[in-house]
From Swiss-Prot:
PROSITE patterns: RIBOSOMAL_S14. Binds 16S rRNA, required for the assembly of 30S particles and may also be responsible for determining the conformation of the 16S rRNA at the A site. This is Small ribosomal subunit protein uS14. The lineage of its organism: Bacteria, Pseudomonadati, Pseudomonadota, Gammaproteobacteria, Pseudomonadales. It comes from Pseudomonas aeruginosa (strain ATCC 15692 / DSM 22644 / CIP 104116 / JCM 14847 / LMG 12228 / 1C / PRS 101 / PAO1). The keyword GTP-binding does not apply. Keywords: Ribonucleoprotein, Ribosomal protein, RNA-binding, rRNA-binding.
Length: 101
């Protein structure tokens, strides 16, 4: 189990990313636009750098919904490998069966 503080920190990051997503996209569009002047690009880069560090989506970490474990995460199920195995053995995941050959 991950510490509650780590789970809360990750939740706070997700909220920050959602809050700044639109503004970040606008600034990045200005920076990537070849028709923008050099000054506009510069101002957009400065504004982007002044945003909080946690506003970037690359700072997010996928975590298991049940335990908060950051490694061995399966996106399709939102679970870590351990909890996914337990759920599959209980039959909680439709269509998922243990491999046998």
């Amino acid at each position: 189990m991950a510490k509650e503080s780590m789970k809360n920190r990750e939740l706070k990051r997700q909220l920050t990313v959602a809050k700044y997503a639109k503004k970040r996209a606008e600034l990045k569009a200005i920076i990537a636009n070849p028709n923008s002047s050099a000054e506009e690009r510069w101002n957009a880069q400065v504004a982007l750098q002044k945003q909080p560090r946690d506003a970037s989506a690359s700072r997010l970490r996928n975590r298991c919904r049940l335990t908060g474990r950051p490694h061995g995460f399966y996106r399709k199920f939102g679970l870590s490998r351990n909890k996914l195995r337990e759920a599959a053995m209980r039959g909680d995941v439709p269509g998922l069966v243990k491999a046998s050959w």
